[in-house]
UniProtKB/Swiss-Prot annotation:
InterPro entries: Ribosomal_uL11, Ribosomal_uL11_bac-typ, Ribosomal_uL11_C, Ribosomal_uL11_C_sf, Ribosomal_uL11_CS, Ribosomal_uL11_N, Ribosomal_uL11_N_sf
UniProt cross-references to Pfam families, sorted A to Z: Ribosomal_L11 (PF00298), Ribosomal_L11_N (PF03946)
Gene encoding the protein: rplK
Subunit structure, as described in the record: Part of the ribosomal stalk of the 50S ribosomal subunit. Interacts with L10 and the large rRNA to form the base of the stalk. L10 forms an elongated spine to which L12 dimers bind in a sequential fashion forming a multimeric L10(L12)X complex.
Name of the protein: Large ribosomal subunit protein uL11
Gene Ontology molecular function, alphabetical: large ribosomal subunit rRNA binding; structural constituent of ribosome
GO BP, one annotated term: translation
Family statement drawn from the similarity comment of this UniProt entry: Belongs to the universal ribosomal protein uL11 family.
Post-translational modification comment from the UniProt entry: One or more lysine residues are methylated.
Function: Forms part of the ribosomal stalk which helps the ribosome interact with GTP-bound translation factors.
């Protein structure tokens, strides 16, 4: 007989830094087991924010799926800024290249709703614009 799903939660933790806390307690899962497995699974992504989808079952067991780091976080890292513009229409806080956008889009491709790398790049460019980050090299991009 299949296990009964009690809850599905989408959370974000820093890689290798998941700790038992209120957000995990509310799921009713074995918190030490989750934190150990999550931290082991994210060893190669140290310093990044890692979104995770946790499926909790009625017997306190769980499954989880790691997602790619959010585009906004990656853009801030590439642009070397702490936060985006408070008003992206009038402020520009940083500049990134189209090559930076391409590398982020290639990394994010599995989690994006895009069929081509160009479509993925357009989504990342939209995120950059909303953060007040200017993209250089747009004249080559259609």
């Amino acid at each position: 007989m299949a296990k009964k799903i009690t809850r599905i939660a989408k959370l974000e933790f820093m890689a290798m830094q998941a700790k038992p806390g209120a957000e995990l307690a509310s799921l009713g899962i074995n918190m030490p087991a989750f934190t150990r497995e999550f931290n082991d699974a994210t060893k190669d992504r140290a310093g990044d924010v890692v979104p995770v989808v946790i499926t909790a079952y009625d017997d306190k067991s769980f499954d989880f799926v790691l997602k790619t780091t959010p585009a906004a976080y990656m853009l801030k890292k590439v642009a070397k800024i702490e936060k985006g513009a408070s008003n992206s229409k009038t402020q520009t806080v940083a500049t990134v290249t189209l090559d930076d956008i391409r590398s982020i889009a290639e990394y994010k491709m599995p989690d994006l709703n895009a069929n081509t790398i160009e479509a993925a790049m357009k989504q990342i460019i939209g995120t950059a614009k909303n953060m007040g980050i200017k993209v250089t090299g747009m004249e080559d991009f259609k």
